[in-house]
Curated annotation (Swiss-Prot):
HAMAP family: EPSP_synth. The gene is aroA. It is found in: Cytoplasm. Keywords: Amino-acid biosynthesis, Aromatic amino acid biosynthesis, Cytoplasm, Transferase. GO terms for molecular function: 3-phosphoshikimate 1-carboxyvinyltransferase activity. The keyword Transferase applies. It comes from Clostridium acetobutylicum (strain ATCC 824 / DSM 792 / JCM 1419 / IAM 19013 / LMG 5710 / NBRC 13948 / NRRL B-527 / VKM B-1787 / 2291 / W). Pfam families: EPSP_synthase (PF00275). The active site is at residue 306. Pathway: Metabolic intermediate biosynthesis; chorismate biosynthesis; chorismate from D-erythrose 4-phosphate and phosphoenolpyruvate: step 6/7. It catalyses: 3-phosphoshikimate + phosphoenolpyruvate = 5-O-(1-carboxyvinyl)-3-phosphoshikimate + phosphate. This is 3-phosphoshikimate 1-carboxyvinyltransferase. Monomer. 3-phosphoshikimate binds at residues 21-22, 26, 166-168, 194, 306, 333.
Length: 428
């Protein structure tokens, strides 16, 4: 286990935002479904992205790093598909397992999906219901969903999904249904949450020549027998990661974020609007933020659940009360993120009450500091690291290595901006 100790400090400077993990997954998958070669630039090798690359390779993709630039990949689908049983380790990546399950069923296959940590317990019921309806054989251990063995082939038709589940299930079907022999419809039975992630999937597929007809987010018509074309695509910066630095600037600094796209479809771009509503000094042209006096607001997290950990930190250091609502899905992420943030922020001296679907936070000028746990969750660790900037004493975070899931260089970037960061390992 690794630990970091962060002393209170002011951050200043420019930071190159890592490539979007969400867009990286989608670009790699689309390229791997095309028999024409694609070039995907600006890939960051987080654990989650590596899991998707390895998984798509197991399903028949040829993925080669550019000899001159290892952040560039050459990808295409190989025509021959192995009939042997395929084993795919998804590590702790929910995107990988939920995207690749339907993809593995485009052709007749026998596949075992496995994973680590909390991933073995994150729900897959939406797919199990489809398997039962479409007569696809599957099995998994009692009490958990992985390892999951699947045997069969997906058939085109009607697919009913509720809108209040992870959008990863909807995206997973969108990656597979265009390649089936008949037309399909995804019918959304309740109000769709995380719309931005669905938009990103549809847009990425379109870049590779696949058309999906969006009928006001109530249903999606998907014509069968489509083919992906090869293309060249550069992954833009990740707003969910930029959120940590924009928040850091507002709490105690002056930070400019580089490599972001103001026209991005990323749902987490809403961080700009939320921080401004809280009184944060945000320049949307330069993607910069500086120390500001912020105040509490009501935050509806239904469309931006990944922002809740860092927004709860900003709320804990803002005048007045902040209420975060519609965030129940955070209880089944890498950790129970509502419980994790309430528990760890309170250790630092914050006033956070855990609600059934959110958090109630009474802000303070400063927190005390102390020792906290990462819950083996990258977003919890990074949020607590930013909280340390406005504490009276140092903050020690146990299990800090978990940031490798999405942002391996987070602690070094914190140092680069002037953070007083000390890292050490306690061994296994």
């Amino acid at each position: 286990m690794n630990c970091v100790k962060i002393n209170p400090c002011c951050l200043k400077g420019d930071i190159k935002i890592p490539p979007s993990k969400s867009l990286g997954h989608r670009a790699i998958i689309c390229a791997a479904l095309s028999e024409e070669e694609s070039t995907i630039e600006n890939i960051s090798y987080s654990k989650d992205i590596k899991a998707t690359c390895i998984g798509m390779s197991k399903l028949g993709a040829l993925i080669i790093e550019d000899a001159k630039d290892n952040s560039t990949l050459k990808i295409k689908k190989q025509k021959l598909v192995s009939k042997e049983k395929v084993y795919i380790d998804c590590s702790e990546s929910g995107s990988t397992v939920r995207f690749l399950i339907p993809i593995s069923l485009i052709e007749e296959r026998n596949v075992v999906f496995d994973g680590q940590g909390k991933l073995s317990y994150r729900p897959l019921d939406s797919y199990f219901n489809i398997f039962d309806e479409k007569e696809i054989a599957y099995s998994h251990p009692e009490g958990k969903v992985l390892p999951l063995q699947i045997k069969g082939r997906l058939k085109a038709g009607m697919f009913n999904l509720p809108g209040n589940i992870s959008s990863q299930f909807i995206s997973g079907l969108m990656f597979s249904l265009p390649f089936l022999e008949g037309d399909s419809i995804i019918n959304i039975t309740t109000n769709l949450e995380s719309v931005g992630y669905v938009d990103m999937t549809i847009d990425m597929l379109k870049k590779f020549g696949i058309e999906i007809e969006n009928k006001a987010y109530k249903s999606f018509f998907i014509k069968g027998n489509q083919k992906c074309k090869g293309t060249k695509y550069k992954v833009e910066g990740d707003f969910s990661q930029a959120a940590f630095w924009l928040s850091a600037g507002i709490l105690n600094g002056n930070i400019n974020c580089k490599d972001l796209n103001i026209s991005s479809l990323q749902g987490d771009k809403v961080i700009l609007d939320i921080l401004k509503k809280m009184g944060g000094a945000i320049d949307e042209k330069s993607f910069s933020s500086k120390k500001s006096h912020t105040h509490g607001i009501v935050i509806d997290a239904s469309q931006c659940p990944d922002l809740v950990p860092i927004l709860s930190v900003v709320a804990a250091l803002s005048e007045g009360t902040t209420k975060i609502v519609n965030a129940a899905r955070l209880r089944i992420k890498e950790s129970d993120r509502l419980k994790a943030m309430a528990t760890e922020l309170n250790k630092l001296g914050a006033e956070v009450v855990e609600l059934e679907d959110g958090l109630l936070i009474e802000g303070k000028e400063k927190l005390k500091g102390g020792e906290v746990e990462s819950w083996n969750d990258h977003r919890i660790a990074m949020a607590l690291g930013i909280a340390a900037l406005r504490c009276e004493e140092s903050v020690t975070i146990n299990g800090s290595e978990c940031v490798s899931k999405s942002y391996p260089q987070f602690w070094s970037d914190l140092k680069q901006l002037g953070g007083d960061v000390h890292e050490w390992s306690l061994g296994e």
